């Protein structure tokens, strides 16, 4: 046998072994492949009624048949004379406010600029001290007469960096004869409510985002990178700050912290809900209103886009990703949870909670 013939035989034997090995690997891989197509008449195919869609595991808010006959009873309506914070009171619990119908438009007035590609109106008007205070898309603050909408004063809050003109977020709050405002830039200002004159300005490293809450001699507002500032109302000094988990994906809303006594409850874009001591910012408890398994990219955003609400010893909060929960204010114990998500603060009236889901 020549060397050439021996080489050919060795090559053929090697190819045969290799093909056999490939066939074996292919057979093994086929048994492990979860996406292998199974014919309908395959005896090993599971019955059709045993196939469960993964969508069936998605939880959603369902009506309880046992509660269908429960009467919805609201507390006695009262006449509210002030709306000094973005969500009414510092606790955000407005209960059952009185209004005699039918409601008619008292006046209609255009003022300032609207939203555009570089700025957006996220701030809500407030009412205090017999005046309406509002902000336009440029960050101008207006004081208006509630009887006819006539302008009392107008103030332009200028960003020191002229190149930084883009702003999203903002809000106003009133306390002690002052209007506390930010327009989505790197500062929060205190204005004299009577004249609009700027009293002081507190600066931050990143733009403010959440609407301010002003109560108890302090102003609370958080920034785009989830850092909460507590600022002295009298002089604008930063008393303390709390850094939440940074989260770049958030919604264009302006929630505000809820405050009751010495407890501050802060919502963050990461889905965190943190209770802090108003004196020093020390954490009392925290929880995460996060939910995985969203079917779309936007459903995975965990932002607590609406303000939390404090009623007595309970806290109610809802994240965009689909968690509505009630907590004990003192301990942070989660009392109950429902699969509901939205952009707005829940409204509590008596023993009932009203909300709009997304």
Predicted regions and their residues:
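Blade/loop signatures of beta-propeller domains
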Residues: 44-63, 69-106
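Bacterial signal peptide processing site
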Residues: 23-26
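Extracytoplasmic beta-rich repeat domains
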Residues: 106-126, 154-173, 200-215, 238-260, ...
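Short loop/turn segments that connect beta-strands within beta-propeller blades
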Residues: 145-148, 192-196, 232-236, 278-281, ...
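C-terminal motif of bacterial Sec signal peptides marking the signal peptidase cleavage site
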Residues: 18-21
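Structural signature of WD-repeat beta-propellers
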Residues: 136-137, 167, 176, 183-184, ...
């Amino acid at each position: 046998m020549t060397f050439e013939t021996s080489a050919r035989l060795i090559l053929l034997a090697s190819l045969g072994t290799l093909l056999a090995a490939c066939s074996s690997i292919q057979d093994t891989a086929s048994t492990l492949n979860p996406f292998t197509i199974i014919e309908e008449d395959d005896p090993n195919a599971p019955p059709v009624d045993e196939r469960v869609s993964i969508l069936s595991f998605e939880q959603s808010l369902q009506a309880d048949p046992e509660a269908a006959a429960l009467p919805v009873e609201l507390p006695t309506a009262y006449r509210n004379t002030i709306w000094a914070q973005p969500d009414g009171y510092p606790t955000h619990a407005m209960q059952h406010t009185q209004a005699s119908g039918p409601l008619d438009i008292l006046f209609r007035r255009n003022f300032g600029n609207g939203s555009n590609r570089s700025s957006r109106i996220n701030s809500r008007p407030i009412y205090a001290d017999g005046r309406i205070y509002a902000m336009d898309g440029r960050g101008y603050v207006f004081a208006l007469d509630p009887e006819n909408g006539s302008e009392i004063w107008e103030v332009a809050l200028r960003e020191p960096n002229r190149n930084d003109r883009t702003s999203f977020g903002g809000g106003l709050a009133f306390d002690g004869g002052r209007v506390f405002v930010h327009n989505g830039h790197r500062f929060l200002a205190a204005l004299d409510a009577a004249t609009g004159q700027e009293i002081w300005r507190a600066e931050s490293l990143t733009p403010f985002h959440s609407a301010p809450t002003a109560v108890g001699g302090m102003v609370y507002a958080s920034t785009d990178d989830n850092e909460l500032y507590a600022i002295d109302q009298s002089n604008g000094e930063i008393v303390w700050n709390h850094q939440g988990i940074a989260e770049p994906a958030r919604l264009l809303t302006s929630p505000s912290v809820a405050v009751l006594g010495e407890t501050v409850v802060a919502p963050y874009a990461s889905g965190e809900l943190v209770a802090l001591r108003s004196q020093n910012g020390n954490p009392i408890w925290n929880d995460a209103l996060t939910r995985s398994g969203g079917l779309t990219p936007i459903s995975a955003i965990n932002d607590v886009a609406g303000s939390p609400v404090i009623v007595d010893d309970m806290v109610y909060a809802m994240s965009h990703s689909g968690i509505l929960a009630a907590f004990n204010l003192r301990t942070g114990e989660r009392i109950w949870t429902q699969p509901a998500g939205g952009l707005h603060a829940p409204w509590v009236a008596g023993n009932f909670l009203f909300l709009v889901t997304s």
